């Protein structure tokens, strides 16, 4: 989730379930809008290197970050993937996706383990909020 967000379709042709899914997607985008539009953007990996692709939006005050990851096609016995956020306050504590807490230093140097998926091109997001 980055940049502009919208749909090019006729919503009158959608089912009730599809409209509900769209509402949920729009609500999620609005939740992160400020950090996506006004935050600092970092590429965390090289998208052309063949591995996972990751990028990050960070608020100017380092109080919030959104890390986005897209995994490559699944390989048998692939190594565990880790993504390393940037621009965090190393001394601050951050809540990851509203659950666990880690310091900025632990996140930047220890990284975030990327969930292993059984499908190609799966995406994951990590919402980091300073507490």
Where are these regions (language model features)?
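C-terminal beta-strand-rich structural cap/linker in extracellular carbohydrate-active enzymes
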Residues: 104-131
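Active-site-proximal substrate-binding groove within the catalytic cores of carbohydrate-active enzymes
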Residues: 1-100, 104
